[in-house]
Amino acid sequence: MKYDLIIIGSGSVGAAAGYYATRAGLKVLMTDAHMPPHQQGSHHGDTRLIRHAYGEGEKYVPLVLRAQALWDELSTHNEEPIFVRSGVVNLGPADSAFLANVARSAQQWQLNVERLDATALMTRWPEIRVPDNYIGLFEADSGFLRSELAITTWLRLAREAGCAQLFNSPVSHIHHDDNGVTIETSEGCYHASKALISAGTWVKALVPELPVQPVRKVFAWFKADGRYSTKNRFPAFTGEMPNGDQYYGFPAENDELKIGKHNGGQLIQAPEERKPFAAVASDGAEAFPFLRNVLPGIGGCLHGAACTYDNSPDEDFIIDTLPGHENTLVITGLSGHGFKFAPVLGEIAADFALGKTPSFDLTPFRLSRFSQ
């Protein structure tokens, strides 16, 4: 059997692509080296932020707004919502370049963002402590996503729509010829007109020339109470420290508040180098500088997890066909800020398989930018 699209890597982007391509009427085979959702990539840990006024640059805003519409639609397929509109407050020094980008994105796209000075911040959320020179940019319409629930939902919907799924079966080789794409797996060879490579951190095992660096990252849950929950209108947050370190976190659930540090981490070259949480001495203390200064009421570390970023050199996404192989799309280099975009990236992949021109300007995400 020849498929219209084979998906290599069915985590966040791959799971979304499988659903949207199958829903569009294509014959699709989804593959993964593990059984998604799983602990081997970048989608576990229950929650991920979604922000609209994007500190990483205005070029992302059209993508994230389309993603939000798709998240809202996906949430209708579950009793438990996938998107929780908790609001997100972005904290940092008034001269922060990241916050300047947030404000610029909000102005350009007329997004609902409220600027609060330090006094107003601490009045609205007495649990938060910031220096006098700090501000907060509050996005009331943003929030967080249930990442593993989202992937489970996409996989179920794709399967119900007739999508073939081959999991726990790593792809060892990809071959291109005039008839399309062939993949080799432990279960045999499979053929398709087009392929999506969304293999996450270890994409270089299949495409060694891609400029992607795996980075071991950790996040952890700390003792909290009801003051830090959505019931008390406590928001999700990002926070920039005076030294430039970037943190992110979520409202407490079951008296546990999850937080992680966005920058830093350990460069790794192989899956076995991603040691479990607490294997690196600094893991449990990584969030202390933020918690001690900004959320002093939070208690000790309860547990944590390790994940992996697939960092591109400039930490912008890579969305492009492979050089010399126009029938193979690669989506990688999501650099620790990609999950919120998973549905729109999956939709872009489905449009690629359908032969449609993308609805977005993807020029900033081309591979050619690294050779200029």
From Swiss-Prot:
Question: Does the entry feature the keyword RNA-binding, yes or no?
Answer: no
What residue ranges are annotated as transmembrane? none
Oligomeric and partner information: Monomer.
Q: What is this protein called?
A: N-methyl-L-tryptophan oxidase
Reaction(s) catalyzed by this protein?
N(alpha)-methyl-L-tryptophan + O2 + H2O = L-tryptophan + formaldehyde + H2O2
The family this protein is said to belong to = Belongs to the MSOX/MTOX family. MTOX subfamily.
Q: How is the cofactor bound?
A: Binds 1 FAD per subunit.
* Necessary cofactors: FAD
